A protein has these predicted regions:
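Acidic, Ser/Thr-rich peripheral helices and adjacent loops at domain boundaries
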Residues: 371-389, 465-473
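VWA/integrin I-like adhesion module and closely mimicked acidic/polar interface patches used
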Residues: 389, 422-470, 480
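Von Willebrand factor
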Residues: 315-373, 379-419, 424-426, 447-456
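Loop/turn elements at helix/coil->beta-strand transitions in domains of secreted/extracellular proteins
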Residues: 353-355, 412, 441-445
């Protein structure tokens, strides 16, 4: 992709934008949509990216006359207050600048279409520019395919005339744009900033773990192409956007549940020396707060010689997989995005505990997804977001799948979470076999009943049964304590 610029771009900038452009289906689609409206739109996209990515982007004083409209648009973009503030997040950031380019380009294209609709003179000039651009391309193609020297001079004259007419048309477009509504343009740019930040936030919610602030770190582990692809699906797939919002909420709850669980599992079994603030004895804190003993405390603290509680957590060996059996019968459709956000939160716990995670979707049939050590690829997230089985409810099939997952693991102490809003029949022989394997492999089953009262069947195979209105009910959050 070759582009001309009105900014102080260099060969690295142009090469890097070409790489980003080739990774982004959204930018490619936007390029195809924008070029028929404004012939220099592909060049404009490159400049929008450079203005977001470069440390010190500047608009050049002297530019080709055919880029006059681009210069006017870039002046409008870069003068906007929301744009300047946004650059704090996009400078030298490949992902943010790529997402920002798509959003700013989209809003600019929409704004141009609106101005063209309102301004008859602008519409005429842009139509003229489009015709001239098309004629210029045809003339250049004809020149490359015809080696007749006698006609070469005529073609060059015709090309020069077309280029001159194109310059005049683009200059007129720039003048008309200068008189167009700047308030609507500023509003469009502010929307682009907001939408870009929201998309990146949703991306971190999906990819992040349950550790506070882990979203950015987890994001960096994914190749840029994968980051861009998932971000673009979030911005175009409403279901994935909702799933990301629920995942972010549930991961925060899971973080608190896991922290509380860890604190409860730690015994203060004596006194030792060290410098961990949260474990210091009250006496040491008193010495820190008293002027006469503060210096001595700080010296001993720096040397790791302050007295603190000795804590011994329960020793944790390898644990079996975490298995989520998730009802996807037709009645669960309304809670689908909640359910998948819930699944992503459990998956992040498995990742933290370095446990395999299996998601068994069930209705009349089952579909099993396995994620070793709780790790999931961006494309797998999209597949999961788009999957919904529908149909009736059968319990034996997902439970049979859960047994397979548990029995294949070399570790005991698996956790099975069974979620349903329905009821099903289980024959006695299956229940006996399931419970026998459960005892042998040492795993537990927690069942969540959503909006139903019937618990007789799930009690046959569950260690604990909880009733909840939906996944956002506090009773459902008990699952995050596993």
């Amino acid at each position: 992709m070759k582009n001309k610029s009105v900014l102080n771009t260099d060969s690295f900038d142009k090469r890097r934008f070409t790489e980003i452009f080739n990774m982004s289906k959204q930018l490619q689609g936007l390029n195809e949509a924008g070029e028929p409206r404004l012939p220099t739109f592909p060049d404009l996209l490159g400049d929008i990216w450079a203005s977001l990515y470069k440390m010190k982007p500047e608009i050049k004083e002297e530019i080709p006359e055919t880029l006059t409209a681009n210069k006017r648009l870039m002046e409008n973009i870069m003068a906007d207050e929301s744009f300047q503030n946004f650059r704090e997040f996009t400078r030298l950031d490949d992902l943010s600048s790529a997402l920002g380019t798509a959003k700013f380009g989209e809003k600019t294209n929409d704004w141009l279409a609106e101005q063209e609709r309102k301004n008859e003179e602008l519409r005429k000039q842009m139509e003229e520019a489009r015709k001239l651009h098309q004629q210029l391309q045809q003339q250049q193609e004809k020149a490359s395919g015809d080696g007749d020297d006698g006609a070469e001079g005529q073609r060059q004259d015709a090309e020069q005339n077309l280029q001159q007419a194109m310059k005049q048309a683009m200059e007129q477009i720039a003048r008309e744009l200068q008189q167009s509504g700047q308030s609507s343009f500023s509003q469009a740019m502010a929307e682009a900033v907001k939408e870009t930040q929201k998309t990146k936030g949703d991306l971190k919610s999906l990819l992040g773990g349950i550790t506070a602030g882990s979203g950015e770190a987890e994001l960096k582990k994914v190749p840029l192409r994968g980051q861009i692809a998932l971000a673009e699906r979030i911005s175009t797939l409403p279901e994935l956007k909702e799933i990301a919002e629920w995942a972010g909420r549930f991961k925060q709850i899971a973080r608190k549940k896991q922290r509380s669980k860890h604190e409860d599992s730690v015994d203060r079994s004596g006194i030792t020396l060290g410098n961990q603030v949260e474990r210091l004895l009250p006496m040491e804190l008193g010495m820190y707060s008293h002027p006469a003993t503060k210096a001595d405390f700080l010296r001993r603290f720096a040397e790791g010689q302050t007295m603190q509680y000795e804590q011994k957590g329960k020793e944790t060996l390898g644990k079996g997989p975490m298995v989520l059996c998730l009802d996807q019968s037709s009645s669960m459709r309304a809670m689908d995005t909640q359910a998948k956000g819930f699944a992503f939160a459990l998956m992040s716990i498995a990742r933290k505990q370095k446990r395999d995670f299996a998601l068994i979707l069930f209705s009349r049939r089952t579909r099993t997804f396995r994620y070793p050590k709780g790790k999931i690829l961006p494309e797998e997230m999209v597949t999961l977001a788009e999957t919904f089985l529908g149909g009736g409810t059968y319990f034996d099939r997902p439970l049979e799948e859960a047994l397979k997952v548990v029995e294949e693991s070399r570790f005991k102490k698996a956790d099975v979470i069974f979620v349903t809003d329905g009821e099903s029949y289980l024959n006695e022989s299956f229940v006996e076999r399931f419970n026998s394997t459960k005892q042998k492999k040492g795993f537990q089953v927690l069942s969540l009943l959503l909006g139903v009262e019937e618990r007789e069947t799930v009690e046959l195979f569950s260690d604990e049964v909880l009733k909840a209105k939906d996944f956002d009910d506090e009773s459902s959050h008990v699952a995050f304590g596993i």
